[in-house]
Amino acid sequence: MKFLRRSPVQTFLLVPLATIAWEWAVGTLHVELLYALVMLWGYLQYRRCGRYRTARGGGGPGLSGAPPERLVETGVYAWTRNPMYLGHIIYMIGVALTFQSLFAAAIALARTVWFHFRVRRDERGLTARFGEPYIAYTRRVKRWLPGLF
C-alpha cells in the first residue's frame, strides 16, 4: 500500500473517491459536470508539466522522482515555479466545485497548505543544489501565481 502515500495517487484518486463516499454517506451527493473541466485542467497541467520538466533534465515526476540535473526555467516554469503542485491544487478545487462539496474544499485547503510547506522544503534543496541561478530564478518567477505570490 506504499503507492497510496504518493501525492498524485492521493490527489487524483483518493480525494475524488473520498468526496464521493462522504457526500453519498451524508446524502448530499450532487454533480455539476461542467466543473469537471477544472478537474481536467488540473490533471492535464500536472501531467504535461511533469513530462516537460523530465524531458529537460529537471528530475523525475513526483516527490520520489530522480533529482534534477538542471534547473528548468522555460515554458510554464517561466510563469510559476510549481506548476505541477499548482495542477494538484486546481484539480482539487475542481473536485470541490464538481461535487459542490465543503468536504472536498476542506481537503483542498489542507492539501494546499501541505503543498506550500513541501515547496518551501523543496526550495531549500534547490537552493543548495543550484545556488545563485536558482536564487535569481526565485526573484524572477513567483512561487505560485504569476505576478501575485
Which residues does each predicted region cover?
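Membrane-anchoring alpha-helices and their flanking helix-loop junctions
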Residues: 1-77, 86-149
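Extended, alpha-helix-rich binding/interface surfaces that flank or overlap catalytic cores
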Residues: 82
